[in-house]
Amino acid sequence: MAKPAATAAAASEELSQVPDEELLRWSKEELARRLRRAEGEKVGLMLEHGGLMRDVNRRLQQHLLEIRGLKDVNQRLQDDNQELRELCCFLDDDRQKGRKLAREWQRFGRHAAGAVWHEVARSQQKLRELEARQEALLRENLELKELVLLLDEERAALAATGAASGGGGGGGGAGSRSSIDSQASLSGPLSGGAPGAGARDVGDGSSTSSAGSGGSPDHHHHVPPPLLPPGPHKAPDGKAGATRRSLDDLSAPPHHRSIPNGLHDPSSTYIRQLESKVRLLEGDKLLAQQAGSGEFRTLRKGFSPYHSESQLASLPPSYQDSLQNGPACPAPELPSPPSAGYSPAGQKPEAVVHAMKVLEVHENLDRQLQDSCEEDLSEKEKAIVREMCNVVWRKLGDAASSKPSIRQHLSGNQFKGPL
């Protein structure tokens, strides 16, 4: 194809370069021959051009098909790109929402942690105050117990002195009535009544006045023994004196029953008093050891010598009798009418009434403190605080699992968190 084209081009150049004089000199045959040859060359060129055009058209068609395919691919890619853009926008919105929620949770966590630590500090402060109060009550209880033992020792000395004075002052032919008068003179001051006031039982079924007649020989020489021990003593003042009088009233034996001869020995009475007090102290110690968290208020009071009615009801009957009526005395075999100088059985001593009032004031204060603590937060607020605590502890646990330093810090402060 390239060779005929080159030949035709060369022929046309030759014809175009041939001058007119040369053409006029040629013959007709030469001109016709050259003309046919030029026409043949033109036909060949036209055929060649047609083939080239078909080739170009075929290639153009192929390119058009490729362009259509690329357009389809481009359209699909654009659709995918649009979907990806929408997905990116959606994810960006979620990211913004997540960041906003994370900031809110951080603020909530800081607020919750502050509230929790504030509550923990308040609880620890209250716990320290309660422990201080408990220690003070325990110290006061120990002092009162020591005072009880001291009073028991003084009473034993007084009883021994009174017994010696009574045994020496009733000599001669006083007989059994002088011993009964000495017993009445010993028991009268201990119970709070005047010596010789009211009726007494002489043991033979008849009752006579403790003062006796003026001409009776057995009562004429009887003098009530002194209640103070020998040696200089000053009267108790303030709280110690009131406590001593209250303990004397509580520990005094009940004299509203007649006492047969031989059962009111001062030493045996003192021993029984000590035994009852030891049993009472052991019962208090056992109850204090067995008291749980629900009996914290009872444990905090330290089981003082004055118990409330609810606490008395929880004690055994022997302890109730010891607390309400004083130390136990031997029961008589034959009861007699009560003496006129003593209060009836239903009436409580003044010291017990005063102790009940003090305990009632303590219980009212404790109830007010408990009510004020419960009124600080409602049930809904308590539930919210618990949920906040759970969230904070979960976040602290996640942080501890990811960072060893936080785990070590939490393990070192595990006893400083809220209860």
From Swiss-Prot:
Q: Which residues carry this modification: Phosphoserine?
A: 178, 246
Q: Which residues form a coiled coil?
A: 22-88, 118-159
Where is this protein primarily located? Answer: other
User: From start to end residue, where is composition biased (Low complexity)?
Assistant: 176-189
Q: What UniProt keywords apply to this chain's record, in alphabetical order? A: Acetylation, Cell junction, Coiled coil, Developmental protein, Phosphoprotein, Tight junction
Q: Where is the composition biased (Gly residues)?
A: 164-175
Biological process terms in GO annotation? cell population proliferation; cerebral cortex development; establishment of cell polarity; establishment of protein localization; Notch signaling pathway; radial glial cell differentiation
**Where in this protein does the record say N-acetylalanine is found?**
2
InterPro entries reported for this sequence? CCDC85
Question: Where is the stretch described as Disordered?
Answer: 162-268, 307-348
Q: Kindly list the GO CC terms recorded for this protein.
A: adherens junction; apical junction complex; bicellular tight junction; cell junction; nuclear speck
Q: Where is the composition biased (Polar residues)?
A: 307-325
Role played: May play a role in cell-cell adhesion and epithelium development through its interaction with proteins of the beta-catenin family. May play an important role in cortical development, especially in the maintenance of radial glia.
Assembly and interactions? May interact with ARVCF, CTNND1, CTNND2 and PKP4.
Entry protein name = Coiled-coil domain-containing protein 85C
**Lineage start:** Eukaryota, Metazoa, Chordata, Craniata, Vertebrata
